[in-house]
A protein has these predicted regions:
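Solvent-exposed loop/turn segments flanking beta-strands in beta-repeat/beta-sandwich domains
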Residues: 155-169, 176-177
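Aromatic/hydrophobic beta-strand junction motif of beta-rich domains
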Residues: 74-78, 151-155, 194
Length: 227
């Protein structure tokens, strides 16, 4: 039997017919009409009938260059005007307010969880968005001669690592040696010098990395460097 036939009905065979959204209790009875060794019993279950929910997000941007304190709106909404709640997996990278505005706090990765609760008409729904906040560098200069490549990185994100990779060409299929890495400590400039005397042609790629997230890469604007 159903406690609320306006929501759903159930027949003698246990087939449920849904009428509209809401909540109803179904009671299942075993009357022991066959006079077996089993006692009569009943079981009651609660059935919730809900419309499918979806969470829409206006802002599609999920990667940001690090600038502490920058605020952005996620622009999320749910069907039926259901209230949304927000949480961040890493508030040290991105914090999120009750109104859905994120604030950049540091460099790294954070997952923002958006939840629409069950309001009696629409089902509960959860959506997760992964954000990346990239380390930055204000400028990069490349100088070279027949023997050395000198890379100067200005204002890299503190405590990041400056990385210089030297490839055979702009196709970036073959890497010459290991990456050249220097940790950013104090000061606003990092200089890395690479011995390129053995290479007749090469292609440098420069970027910074922190907490597993890489900055945008800088390359030689004129393509391969040839001697």
């Amino acid at each position: 039997t159903s406690s609320n036939e306006n929501v759903l009905k159930v027949n003698d065979r246990g087939v449920i017919t849904v009428t509209k959204t809401g909540t109803a209790k179904i009671t299942i009875c075993a009357n022991n009409k066959t006079k077996s060794n089993y006692k009569p019993c009943s079981k009651t279950i609660t059935v919730k009938v809900r419309k499918p929910q979806s969470i829409q997000v206006k802002s599609k941007k999920t990667q940001y260059n690090y600038k502490k304190g920058v605020k952005r709106s996620i622009g999320a909404s749910a069907k039926g005007g259901v209230r949304l709640t927000y949480s961040s997996s890493n508030p040290k990278v991105i914090s999120v307010a009750n109104n859905g505005k994120i604030t950049i706090k540091g460099v790294g990765k954070a997952i923002v969880t958006i939840k629409a609760g069950d309001n009696g008409v629409y089902e509960q729904k959860v959506r997760k968005i992964t954000y990346y906040v990239r380390p930055v560098m204000s400028s990069v200069s490349i100088a070279h001669n027949s023997k050395t490549l000198k890379v100067t990185v200005n204002n890299p994100t503190p405590n990041s690592k400056v990385i210089v990779k030297v490839y055979e060409s702009s196709k970036m299929k073959k890497l010459y040696g290991k990456p050249h890495i220097k940790t950013v400590k104090k000061g606003k400039k990092v200089v890395i010098t690479v011995n390129v005397s053995k290479y007749s042609r090469y292609y440098p790629v420069i970027y910074v990395k922190k907490n597993g997230v890489e900055s945008q890469k800088v390359t030689n604007s004129r393509g391969d460097i040839r001697k």
